[in-house]
Structure formats: structure tokens, C-alpha cells
A protein has these predicted regions:
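Post-transcriptional modification and biogenesis factors for structured RNAs
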Residues: 1-177
Length: 177
């Protein structure tokens, strides 16, 4: 077994990415404080052909040198938009028949491994602020809340790690559904 070089990975071009069939997921980032986290999230969304990232509130927007450091060019491939208020984004997505899923620790949350993907559904997955998480009013607007089980002493993941875990899980469930 040998490690592959970047030139051997057969990655698609940015143009091919833009023209390819996307995973029916929109990732919403609400008031994410760290531009480095935003850049890392762009990379994860590129990796799984996510349809769009919707940046909300104080979340940094491209072009931004701090995003660029961790995004490694993925802001050029992944479609993104901005809403000042996440509630407006949610209302628009509901009109477009998206299932609104918040990722948060909540009393009636669904364990991520038990969340069932429905074929032909489109998903909008909301990730909240690094300190306060997803706002309760946003949870109230959601169709479901999923939670990543945790077993250590800390009560949260870094938001970019959380996005990677959840998006990979949804991606694999959609592709095998």
C-alpha cells in the first residue's frame, strides 16, 4: 500500500463541481464567530458535494483571508448565500419544501445514528454559535433536532468537526437510501 499524491486523487475541477449533481443538503451556519471554522466547513461541504452553505448573522463571508486559510479554495466551488436573519432563511427553505434539522442537545433530540433519511427529501441542517449553540427560537422552527452522542467530559464538539460528522452521516445515508 502506498500513499497517493494529490495528482493521483482524480479530483474534479471547480467547473465540474459546479456542474455536478449535488447532495440535497443546505448547511446553515448561524452566528459562527470563527472565520477559521467557516473555512473548514466550506472544505467539508466541498468534500461531500453539498448543495449550498447559507451564512447567517455575524458569520464571516467570503472573500475573507481567515476563511481562505482553512477553506483551501473551496469557497470557489461551494455555492453560498447570506441572510442577516436565519429566520428568513428558514422560512424560504420551508417554502422550498426542505426538512429543517437543527443540530443541538435538546430534551427530545434524535440520536444522529438513529435519524432516518427519507428518499427524495431535501434537508437544511442548522449549526449554531460556538458558545450558545442553536437558538431556541430556531429549534422551535425546526422539523427535527439531531444530536451527536458524546461520552467524554466535554459537552460539545468544535462546530467545524460537528458539521463534518453530521454532513458525512447524512451523505452516506442519502447515497445508500
Amino acid at each position: 500500500m502506498k500513499k497517493l499524491k494529490n495528482s493521483e486523487l482524480n479530483r474534479i475541477s471547480i467547473e465540474e463541481f459546479k456542474n455536478s449533481s449535488k447532495t440535497p443538503i443546505k448547511v446553515l451556519l448561524d452566528n459562527i464567530r470563527s472565520a477559521h471554522n467557516v473555512g473548514s466547513i466550506f472544505r467539508s461541504c466541498d468534500a461531500f458535494l453539498i448543495d449550498e452553505i447559507i451564512l447567517c448573522g455575524i458569520t464571516a463571508k467570503p472573500p475573507n483571508k481567515e476563511i481562505r486559510k482553512t477553506a483551501l479554495g473551496s469557497t470557489d466551488s461551494v455555492k453560498w448565500s447570506y441572510f442577516e436573519n436565519i429566520k428568513d432563511a428558514i422560512l424560504k427553505l420551508k417554502q422550498e419544501k426542505y426538512q429543517i434539522i437543527s443540530v443541538e442537545q435538546a430534551d427530545k433530540s434524535t440520536d444522529l445514528k438513529n435519524f432516518k433519511i427519507q428518499s427524495k427529501k431535501k434537508y437544511a441542517i442548522i449549526f449554531g454559535n460556538e458558545i450558545n449553540g442553536v437558538n431556541q427560537k430556531v429549534i422551535d422552527m425546526s422539523d427535527d433536532v439531531v444530536e451527536i452522542p458524546q461520552f467524554g467530559t466535554k459537552h460539545s464538539f468544535n462546530v467545524s468537526v460537528c458539521v463534518g460528522i453530521v454532513v458525512w452521516d447524512f451523505f452516506t445515508k442519502i447515497k445508500t437510501n
